[in-house]
Amino acid sequence: LLISSKGFQSYLEKEHRVHSDRIVYMPQYAEDLFTQKLETVEHQDVNLVFAGNVGIAQNVDTILMAADALKEERRIKWHIVGDGVDLERCKEMAKTKGLNCIIFHGRKPLEEMPYYYAMADAMLLTLMDDPDISRTLPGKVQTYMAAGKPILCAANGEVQDVIHEANCGYAVNAGDWQGLAKYVKRFLEQRNSVPFGEN
């Protein structure tokens, strides 16, 4: 059995009594265009980019709440690049909170995505608090890492493990917008001295 996340191994062994000899870990790969050196995009602000599906499982509320907590930090721009069933609600939430620092770009073709990665000072990753989701490793993790970008994350389980092992960013528990805001501030203070993203 091929698994894309190590979190599935213990689940298969315990719940389905699959012997470890039958399980092979094969993580998802990043598209080649993200493994090449990204062109530099000159910018004055600090750009934090979330890329991908904007669904219930992605818990983008965590980003919006962190942005709300840090809205006095006017140099931070929070970019949401993607589409999904929760996008319109997130837009409405941002509007209600007066979060002009959040920019919704909508869905973009794959060939345009390197631009958004190049403009990013760090990438954002959030997931909801769910035991099944905590066993997964979203493909965007490999893509973020392949692009050499630091990851600021609020998710449980496998994602946290990978970020800590690779030393490629900061991770807090799913839904912890206060913790995410704290680490965004720390990233701002240390981004020129801590070599995150060199993975």
Regions found by a protein language model. Give the residues of each.
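Conserved donor-binding/catalytic core segment of Leloir-type glycosyltransferases
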Residues: 2, 30, 41-58, 63-67, ...
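Carbohydrate-associated surface elements
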Residues: 7, 26-29
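Nucleotide-activated donor-binding/catalytic signature segment of Leloir-type glycosyltransferases, i.e.
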Residues: 45, 77-82, 88-114
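Short acidic alpha-helix that forms the nucleotide-activated donor recognition element
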Residues: 68, 88-89, 109-120, 145-146, ...
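Short hydrophobic beta-strand element within catalytic cores of glycosyltransferases
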Residues: 122-125, 143-154
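Short Ser/Thr-rich beta->loop micro-motif in glycosyltransferases that lines
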Residues: 125-134
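Conserved donor-nucleotide binding/catalytic region of nucleotide-linked donor-dependent transferases
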Residues: 185-199
